[in-house]
């Protein structure tokens, strides 16, 4: 298989499916694989890099048993524990990210689903942000009903995040308190509501390369718009604490073949950027087109966002948010 020829075929409309033999992605030389992925990214997505930032709106005490997660109540970690944040803190974070040129801002909450009074608080916070800010708004609040997704959409949320985490085969090895199919059903509700669907996973949890390929194909089948790729950073106290970190080469290979299989999606760097050269610069030469940036309300957040924007601009990427262009 000539990987660069395949890249050109994808640019001209070919789409890879579950019926194709994708094993060549696991054995081909990394350099041409990344080169082809970057060509696909440029042709199918363009040079605009989508920057998003998150705030941990509610932390800890999660009843789910995801083996990688510090916020699970099943494990003894040093995770912060608090209820839904005051709206003032959320609005301050949103405005700070907007002032630094971030494209999207999301409230992320621990737990199976945000419900009751806390969900009402979230709706009010989104309505306020939508009224006072121009930044795009996203949410990540677990297994929500179609009715709750509609309320978020009406409040100004345009994208909903809900990771499938891994392949369907491997999912029971990672979590037993909910199922892969429940994840898929939630994403279908997101698409039905007309919101952008953001879903990816974590690599380096003991899965096989075939599991990663399967996850990439599953996301393509679901029509996912934004695919965050996290490289596991093992957390003390969790069942995966002793797993080794992935090599940079493994992360880049994964990002690259995700781009071949999902040519029009935003492939988004998430956790594990520290494992990559210059905090992810190499990934942006291997098919990545988006990243999570910043660090909530710390002083370091602004410095991190500015550093990311500078690095990306040096690669010739467009880091100007739409709301600045419209001003």
Regions found by a protein language model. Give the residues of each.
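Core AdoMet radical
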Residues: 74-93, 97-190, 195-200, 225-230
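N-terminal pre-triad scaffold of radical SAM enzymes
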Residues: 34-75, 82-106
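Short, electropositive alpha-helical surface patch
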Residues: 119-128, 155-161, 209-225, 279-294
């Amino acid at each position: 298989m000539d990987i660069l020829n395949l890249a050109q075929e994808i640019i001209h409309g070919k789409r890879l499916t579950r019926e194709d033999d994708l094993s060549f992605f696991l054995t081909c030389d990394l350099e041409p694989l990344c080169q082809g992925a970057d060509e696909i990214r440029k042709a199918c997505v363009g040079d605009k890099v989508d920057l998003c930032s998150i705030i941990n709106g509610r932390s800890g005490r999660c009843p789910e048993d995801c083996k990688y997660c510090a916020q699970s109540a099943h494990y003894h970690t040093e995770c912060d524990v608090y209820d839904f944040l005051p709206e003032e803190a959320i609005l301050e974070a949103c405005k700070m990210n907007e002032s630094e040129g971030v494209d999207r801002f999301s409230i992320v909450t621990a737990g199976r689903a945000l419900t009751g009074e806390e969900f009402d608080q979230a709706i009010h916070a989104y309505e306020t942000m939508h009224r006072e800010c121009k930044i795009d708004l996203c949410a990540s609040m677990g297994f929500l009903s179609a009715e709750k997704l509609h309320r978020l959409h009406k409040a100004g949320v345009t994208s909903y995040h809900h990771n499938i985490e891994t392949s369907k085969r491997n999912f029971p090895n990672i979590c037993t308190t909910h199922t892969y199919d429940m994840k898929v059903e939630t994403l279908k509700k997101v698409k039905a509501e007309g919101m952008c669907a953001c879903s990816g996973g974590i690599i380096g949890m003991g899965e096989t390369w075939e599991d990663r390929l399967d996850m990439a194909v599953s996301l393509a089948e679901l029509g996912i718009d934004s695919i965050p790729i996290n490289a596991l950073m093992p957390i003390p106290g969790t069942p995966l604490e002793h797993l080794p970190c992935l090599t940079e080469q493994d992360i880049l290979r994964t990002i690259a073949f995700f781009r071949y299989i999902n040519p029009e999606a935003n492939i988004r760097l998430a956790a594990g950027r520290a494992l990559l050269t210059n905090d992810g610069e190499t990934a942006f030469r291997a098919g990545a087109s988006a990243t999570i940036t910043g660090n909530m309300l710390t002083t370091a957040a602004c410095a991190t966002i500015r550093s990311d924007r500078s690095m990306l601009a040096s690669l010739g990427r467009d880091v100007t948010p739409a709301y600045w262009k419209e001003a």
